[in-house]
Amino acid sequence: MNYKPNIFYWSPFLVPIATPKAVVNSATALQNYGKKYECSIINFFGEFNPYQNELKDKNIKLINHFSEKLLKILPKHGKLQSRFSFMVIFILSFFPLKKLISNQKPDFLIIHLITSLPLILLIFYKFETKFILRISGLPKLGIFRKFLWKKALSKIYKVTCPTKSTANYIESLGIVDKEKIITLYDPIVQISKSNFQKKKSINLPFEKSEYFFTAGRLTKQKNFLFLCKAVKRIILDVPNFKIVIAGEGEDKDKISSFIQKNELEKHIFLIGYVPNIFPYIFSSKGFILTSLWEDPGFVLIEAASCRVPVFSSNCPEGPKEIIKDNFNGLLFESNDENDLIKNFSKFNKIINNNETKKKLILNNLILARQFSLFNHYLKLNEILSNGCN
C-alpha cells in the first residue's frame, strides 16, 4: 500500500466566517482530486463540529481535544472580548498542539487562523513537520511582531497568499525568502454544490429580483453603516430600492438604530446569520460589497458563481484585483459615499439592460473559475509534492 502524506489544518475560530469554509474546501479538494493524501482538521474547541457530517462523508478526520462547552462560554463579539478569547485559546492550546505535532508527525501543518501559536512553536521547537503559513488579510506587524515573524518564517516551508497583491506585500516586508511566497487562490467555487444550494427556498416579504443583497460580519471592516447612509440617498432617485443584509456582529445595534431612526425599514432588511446565502444571492438583482478591505472576498466569488452582477468598493486586496471596472463588475471609490451614489446609478442602468448585464455576468463567471476547488488542488498539490520529494 502506497504511503499517503498526512496534512493537518490549524484554523481555530470563534464565529462563522469565510476561513473555515476555505479550510473544509481545501481538505475536500485534496481528498477528492488527489486521493493520495490523508487530511485532518484540528478541532480543539469543537469549532468545526457544524461541519462534522460533511467531513465524515468526505473521509476528512477531525482531531478533537477540548469540549465545545468552552467555546460556548468564550466572548465572541467586540475587539477586546475576542482578543481575550484568542488569548485563552492560545494558552490552552500551546502544549497540546506541540504534543500533537510531535507525536503524530504530520507531513504538513497548514496554518490559517491564530497563526501566532504555531509560529512561536516553530521558533522554539524542532519538528519533522513542514509548516505552511496561509495569509488571510494583510498582517499588521509592529517591530516586535515583525522580529518574531522573521524568526519563524526562516524555518517555514512555504507562505501562501490569496491574491497577487498580498504576495507582493509580503515580499516587500523582507521577512521571508521570495522563493517561499506563493499565490494560492482560495477554494471557493464548487459549481455542483452552489447550483444545488441556490435552488433552496427563501422567505422574504417581497418577490425575487426586487432586492440587492450583501453579506458579512456586521463589523467595521464590512462598512455596512456606510452602506445604510448611502441607501438613505439612493432611495431619493430609486424609491423602490431594497437591500438585504445577512450577518451578525458587534455593529448590529448601531446599524439597527440607524435604520429605525431614519425610517429605512422598508428599504434595508437585516436577516441575521444565514448558513446558506446562495439562494439569497441567486434571487437578487445584484450583489453589493462596501468593505474597507477583503482578501480576497469570498462573497464576491460566490456572487459570480451565482451569475449575479457585482457592485463593489475598490478596496484592497481582493476586490481591487478581482473586479475589473466595467468588465466583470462595477467599482466605486472605497468609503466614498458620493462616488458610490454616482456609480450605483451607472450600475443600475447596466443591469437593466440585458445585453450589458449578460456580458458583465459572463466575464465574472469566467474569472471566478480560478477560485474553483480543482484549481486550488492543482496548485496545492504542486506545493505538497515538492515538499515530499
Place the predicted regions along the sequence by residue.
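A conserved mid-protein helix/loop that constitutes part of the nucleotide-sugar donor-binding site
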Residues: 17-28, 210-236, 243, 250-256, ...
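Short His-centered aromatic/hydrophobic patch
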Residues: 89-93, 111-117, 135
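A short, well-ordered alpha-helix in the C-terminal region of glycosyltransferases
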Residues: 355-370
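A short, active-site helix/loop in glycosyltransferases that binds the activated sugar's phosphate group
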Residues: 156-181, 188
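Short hydrophobic beta-strand element within catalytic cores of glycosyltransferases
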Residues: 309-313
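Conserved acidic donor-binding segment of nucleotide-sugar-dependent glycosyltransferases
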Residues: 325-326, 330-338, 346-352
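N-terminal strand-loop element at the rim of the active site
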Residues: 9-17, 29-87, 180
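Aromatic "clamp/platform" in nucleotide-sugar-dependent glycosyltransferases that forms part
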Residues: 273, 292
